[in-house]
């Protein structure tokens, strides 16, 4: 218990919350913020203000500080670093005692770390760049309901990335026509098809009808190909009660996998659904709709690597990560960094990939990285190189935009992927020799040849907005 005398009034945050001599404990939750302070606010004061407002502090001294051990519970700003190439901002490293957070509650962690502090007047902009979750905390979270190895065993598919596609047009199809598209793509060679993130239960296609027609399509494709297939049935709903109603119906239909929009649906709903999937033997695909609102501004918000870590703790078997090469934002090194955070057991600090801390996941299962957004056959050599086997390569327009139809588009993607995996396994640098690898495969696949001709000029060569900070 504190023995300090109560001294009313307002004092600088740095007097209490700036502790440069502090050595973080293994059990501390560590955070790195990019801070852009207001003019005339010192770095130390701004860092301390963030530590205070995200832990025990308020704008004035309060007498009830004497009723607790403030030195034990407070967040501590313990280090400040320059941001390469940015004279306005700096990195503030803050350590939080684990007792500040409810066990297994990502909701509680985020409420503290990215709550009111992000509207604090002492800073002009604030971004949460990374979190180190101590193993003590990781062990209190359920994590992915199944994990990579369990999914491979259930789907009986090994040695290559999974292949998927989002049904297009994403809105407006009737349930019967929607099911037809699913069947054609699965029959053509894909492993999964997917509801778009904004397909819920609209007037043109109510969820029950979609689930029924899609389940029939999956069963038919499985019978004809002899392969296990699946469709991500989106159970995201206006209420948790309705979400579970849809999940139960998907289970009754025999679906192997369901889907949730984890940011718009919320972490409470997501963790609850992950627990249900674990108990009911269901795979869980996670879409990240709304992420760019939160993570794309390089000075304010939350970096996606943090959202990815939070999702792994909350629970999900797949997570969309961008593609690097497609239509969506994504720096290559940064993407490789957070993909490792999804899949590996231990990831060391690596500033070249935007990783500010070591992260130990213990025995928590991994999450499949999903590459989706503006990709086609010409991207496959790069995608296989970047994401490896434990991933889902998901082609929407890159399947259904094929001149010969959905089945041909699926066949082209399957042939191209298997050709790239084979060449890679034989030691070929497939990204460097992409044209030769694909052209050789196309000699035996007219579907691939047509796809290559159709999309040979299609590139998305825009500069990345959210780049890694580098000198």
From Swiss-Prot:
Q: What class of enzyme is it?
A: lyase
Q: Residues in the active site?
A: 168 (proton acceptor), 287 (proton acceptor)
Alphabetized Gene3D superfamilies for the sequence = Ribulose bisphosphate carboxylase, large subunit, C-terminal domain (3.20.20.110), RuBisCO large subunit, N-terminal domain (3.30.70.150)
The site annotation (Transition state stabilizer) covers: 327
Q: Which cofactor does it need?
A: Mg(2+)
Q: Which PROSITE patterns match?
A: RUBISCO_LARGE
Q: Name one GO biological process term.
A: reductive pentose-phosphate cycle
Q: Which reaction does it catalyse?
A: 2 (2R)-3-phosphoglycerate + 2 H(+) = D-ribulose 1,5-bisphosphate + CO2 + H2O; D-ribulose 1,5-bisphosphate + O2 = 2-phosphoglycolate + (2R)-3-phosphoglycerate + 2 H(+)
Q: What is its EC number?
A: 4.1.1.39
Q: Mind telling me which PANTHER family this protein's record contains?
A: RIBULOSE BISPHOSPHATE CARBOXYLASE, RIBULOSE BISPHOSPHATE CARBOXYLASE LARGE CHAIN
Q: Which family does it belong to?
A: Belongs to the RuBisCO large chain family. Type I subfamily.
Q: What does this protein do?
A: RuBisCO catalyzes two reactions: the carboxylation of D-ribulose 1,5-bisphosphate, the primary event in carbon dioxide fixation, as well as the oxidative fragmentation of the pentose substrate. Both reactions occur simultaneously and in competition at the same active site.
HAMAP family named among the record's database cross-references: RuBisCO_L_type1
Protein's name in the database: Ribulose bisphosphate carboxylase large chain 2
